[in-house]
Swiss-Prot record:
InterPro entries: 2-IPM_HCS-like, 4OH_2_O-val_aldolase, Aldolase_TIM, DmpG_comm, DRE_TIM_HOA, PYR_CT. The active site is at H16. One of its GO terms (biological process) is L-leucine biosynthetic process. Residues 4-254 form the Pyruvate carboxyltransferase domain. This is 4-hydroxy-2-oxovalerate aldolase. Transmembrane segments: none annotated. Gene3D superfamilies: 1.10.8.60, Aldolase class I (3.20.20.70). The record marks R12 as: Transition state stabilizer. The keyword Lyase applies. It catalyses: (S)-4-hydroxy-2-oxopentanoate = acetaldehyde + pyruvate. Keywords: Aromatic hydrocarbons catabolism, Lyase, Manganese, Metal-binding. Its EC number is 4.1.3.39.
Length: 336
């Protein structure tokens, strides 16, 4: 196991948990703490990436561009990263983000749709950025299939491709198998992004590292979507115990989590019933509220809806299946 590069995504994935209400002061405080603790890359955007601030995804209290500028000014050593989802972020937003200090672009697609990212990788490379591919909902497809999708991203110019456990659905063996498949196929680096819906954020990250992952993600205090992410301070402590600390100040990260992030958190992400259901079913977290609403209307347990959606391997954008599945469950109940 080699010492990995850590990207802290408190100010991006954590935006979901904060309902996109980060302030300039929050960014200054968090970036300063992470930078002093030796974190090399800090991701800053709306939870759904550049241009994510919208009626559909939730409006940001402060614009991405202003937060990115604050981050760049606050960081003495760390590089500033941004997330971009094809179909949401465009060249205009990316160009503006680069002008304000973005140096690393992470381009995220569903794990079945790497082909839609070609233009975005080339655009980022033309702007001189380091590029990272994000294969979201990676648990949905086999290691071999993921490797093929990752190969596309590599061919478009990705410097690293991540296995992304968006739903927190993987077991350690799943994380290891997918990372290993990418390592066996790609020439570029491989990363792993964990969520904690089944309580396995740290365990899955360790399994990914043992399988050869070069880059990993964390959030201070685990602040992120669903049940949260692998906690940056925990990752630092574990890496140090394993003898592969990449230069992180463990105590400083513990203090950052406790004194900088914890006081501003609206709640502590935790594997509660809803979060466990998402991880157990293996569906995207945006399905939850829709399933609850439809379930209440039709008298169907929303967990049954989500589990069936997971069995059918639905991905983001297929929310219309929720009603169909609920109606099928009603018909089955009536026939019983």
């Amino acid at each position: 196991m080699n010492a990995p590069r850590l990207t802290d995504t408190t100010l991006r994935d954590g935006s979901h948990a904060m309902r996109h209400m980060f302030t300039r002061q929050h960014v200054r405080d968090i970036v300063t703490a992470l930078d002093r603790a030796g974190v090399p890359v800090i991701e800053v955007t709306h939870g759904d990436g550049l241009a994510g601030s919208s009626l559909q995804y939730g409006f940001s209290f402060v614009s991405d561009l202003d937060l990115i500028a604050e981050a760049r000014e606050s960081a003495e050593r760390a590089r500033i990263a941004a997330l971009l989802l094809p179909g949401i972020g465009t060249r205009r937003e990316l160009k503006a983000a680069v002008e304000r200090g973005v140096q690393v672009l992470r381009i995220a697609t569903q794990c079945t749709e790497a082909d839609i990212s070609e233009e975005h990788f080339k655009m980022a490379k033309d702007m001189g950025l380091e590029t990272v591919g994000f294969l979201m909902m990676s648990h949905m497809r086999s290691p071999e299939f993921l490797a093929e999708q990752a190969l596309l991203m590599e061919s478009y110019g990705a410097d690293c491709v991540y296995v992304v456990d968006s739903a927190g659905a993987m077991l350690p063996r799943d994380a290891a198998a997918r990372v290993r498949a990418l390592k066996d196929t790609l020439r570029v680096q491989v990363g792993f992004h964990a969520h904690n819906n089944l309580g396995l954020g740290i365990g899955n990250t360790l399994a990914a590292l043992e399988a050869g992952a070069d880059q990993i993600d964390g959030c201070l205090r685990g602040l992120g979507a669903g049940a949260g992410n692998a906690a940056t301070e925990l990752l630092a402590a574990v890496l140090d115990r394993l003898g592969v600390n990449p230069g992180l100040d463990v105590l400083a990260l513990m203090d950052a989590a406790e004194y900088v992030v914890a006081p501003i958190m609206p709640f502590q992400p935790f594997p509660d019933r809803d979060a466990i259901t998402i991880g157990y079913a293996g569906v995207y977290s945006t399905f939850l509220l829709h399933a609850k609403r439809v379930g209440e209307q039709l008298g169907v347990d929303p967990r049954a809806i989500l589990i069936e959606l997971g069995r059918r391997q639905t991905v983001a954008g297929q929310e219309d299946w929720i009603l169909d599945v609920a109606l099928e469950l009603v018909r089955k109940r009536e026939r019983a």
